[in-house]
Amino acid sequence: MIIYATVVQTINSFVRLESLKEVYGLIWIFVPIFSLVLGIITGVLVIVWLEREISAGIQQRIGPEYAGPLGILQALADGTKLLFKENLRPSRGNTPLFSIGPSIAVISILLSYSVIPFSNHLVLADLNIGIFLWIAISSIAPIGLLMSGYGSNNKYSFLGGLRAAAQSISYEIPLTLCVLSISLLSNSLSTVDIVEAQSKYGFWGWNLWRQPIGFIIFLISSLAECERLPFDLPEAEEELIAGYQTEYSGIKFGLFYVASYLNLLISSLFVTVLYLGGWNISIPYISILELFQRDQIFGTTICIFITLAKTYLFLFISIATRWTLPRLRMDQLLNLGWKFLLPISLGNLLLTTSFQLFSL
């Protein structure tokens, strides 16, 4: 009996050990996801504060200054206010479409962050088709906007949803062609491989210098995909009140607000990854690999800092553009996409393909 009791205790201890391992495994699965979401939320809060401060500087006025030091908690105050507001629904609208639309817009953009590499070893999903995954997922967001506009049973909302879909289709194609040119130069569709391909020649190895035309087209198309001025036709206040957001209030309206800045941040990160060398420091005689060999935590921190510094440089350009240029008309927007950017991006892809074939 004593031997039997000992065996039972041993088996129970092993079972507890295995269950603890499973629990720890589950915890370590969610830790990177939670860290990424926390970083994204912090990045969005910083972008909102930067936009308020930069717009105040451009317009020569004082920005937010009461919510926290230098107004840094203004975005948190706005989010809290929207959280406690009543969620109104149109009486004759399509309630399922009206409710699901904002969630689809936010979730599709959040999933795109999984393929962003912040360093050589810090990427949530290092996939062989990472770039195509981003393009495929980002094309789902306009469907959510169209659902929101249609479900609102409002002519202004429906027109805003149609404009969002038309604008996305018009600028998604030039953007995809620019990405294909980059993948041809890097011989890969993985975001990590694209960054490493730019690290061979330092600063002059960036795709910015090898694809200047593609960089400009990607820049314009990214702003159009984010629906930022001068491309904010889906929510033009003078024409459509607030576009597809007209009937929304409370937290659902806040989701559109968050989705806009999430889209801007992901576009800035992809500009950094595809054209600005990603996490590479690009300073002579300083190698990221040497930093990793000395101290992996220090090297990863430096890589994250470099990536974010390049990202916020593009964000500054986007914010300054919003408060500088006037809004385009709808016909000008579509003509720019179909008659100007699409032929140039297609020619750039054919030229890149020719150079790659002759260099074999």
From Swiss-Prot:
Keywords: Chloroplast, Membrane, NAD, NADP, Plastid, Plastoquinone, Quinone, Thylakoid, Translocase, Transmembrane, Transmembrane helix. Its EC number is 7.1.1.-. InterPro entries: NADH_UbQ_OxRdtase_su1/FPO, NADH_UbQ_OxRdtase_su1_CS. It is a multi-pass membrane protein. It catalyses: a plastoquinone + NADH + (n+1) H(+)(in) = a plastoquinol + NAD(+) + n H(+)(out); a plastoquinone + NADPH + (n+1) H(+)(in) = a plastoquinol + NADP(+) + n H(+)(out). GO terms for cellular component: chloroplast thylakoid membrane. It is found in: Plastid, Chloroplast thylakoid membrane. One of its GO terms (biological process) is photosynthesis, light reaction. Coiled coil: none annotated. The chain crosses the membrane at residues 27-47, 98-118, 129-149, 165-185, 203-223, 248-268, 269-289, 297-317, 340-360. NDH is composed of at least 16 different subunits, 5 of which are encoded in the nucleus. NDH shuttles electrons from NAD(P)H:plastoquinone, via FMN and iron-sulfur (Fe-S) centers, to quinones in the photosynthetic chain and possibly in a chloroplast respiratory chain. The immediate electron acceptor for the enzyme in this species is believed to be plastoquinone. Couples the redox reaction to proton translocation, and thus conserves the redox energy in a proton gradient. Belongs to the complex I subunit 1 family. This is NAD(P)H-quinone oxidoreductase subunit 1, chloroplastic.
